[in-house]
């Protein structure tokens, strides 16, 4: 399992109801169901990923995330997860709203465009960066909304959302002290836990 998925695995509580957006081959859901009695669904559009999910016995729905999550009711889940897909959506801000409609908390990971190697690649060489976290050339990339660590935190403030926890790391998805100290510069991958702000007077 990728190191970023291991971190998400640690953040997911026992017996949670989980929705995994862009679930890939279903590795995370499979491990959580087996080890933590987590139930839920994965959404995936890639036929190969869907086939692998089914082979694992993971509940998977073929769905384009750009179409939203209208087929899920408010608070249908405890947690929504999306790894390395936010930057490929037409409206990432609207998807964040949808994720926090379906669940009170979400976990999101994405490549940090302000990572120092990306800055050097663009600033010194004059080309769009290609790296472990951004492996595609500019002309064939699925990424249409590249953002930075600071950009995402600003979006959360605009939406009055609470960042519960965060982790950042290099292309191998390892968290380390230097990237935690200067995440926007040294963190190649951003991992956020975000929740809705509890309304005053609301009960748990």
Model regions: which residues?
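Conserved alpha-helix/loop element of class I SAM-dependent methyltransferases that forms part
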Residues: 1-15
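A short SAM/SAH-binding and catalytic strip from SAM-dependent methyltransferases
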Residues: 79-90
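Class I SAM-dependent methyltransferase "Motif I" SAM/SAH-binding loop
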Residues: 22-24
């Amino acid at each position: 399992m990728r190191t970023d998925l291991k971190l998400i695995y640690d953040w997911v509580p026992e017996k949670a109801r989980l929705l995994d957006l862009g679930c890939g081959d279903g590795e995370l859901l499979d491990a959580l169901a087996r080890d933590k009695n987590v139930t839920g669904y994965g959404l995936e559009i890639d036929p190969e990923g869907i086939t692998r999910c089914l082979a694992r016995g993971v509940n998977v729905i073929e769905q384009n995330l750009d179409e939203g999550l209208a087929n899920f009711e408010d608070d249908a889940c405890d947690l929504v997860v999306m790894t390395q897909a936010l930057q490929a959506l037409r409206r990432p801000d609207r998807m964040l709203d949808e994720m926090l409609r379906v669940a009170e908390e979400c976990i999101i990971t994405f490549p940090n465009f302000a990572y120092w190697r990306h800055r050097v690649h663009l600033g010194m060489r004059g080309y769009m960066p290609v790296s472990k976290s951004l492996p595609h050339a500019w002309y064939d990339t699925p990424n249409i909304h590249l953002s930075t660590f600071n950009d995402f935190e600003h979006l959360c403030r605009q939406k009055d959302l609470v960042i519960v926890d965060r982790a950042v790391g290099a292309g191998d998805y390892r968290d380390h002290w230097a990237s935690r100290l200067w995440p926007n510069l040294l963190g190649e991958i951003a991992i956020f836990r975000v929740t809705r702000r509890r309304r005053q007077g609301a009960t748990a």
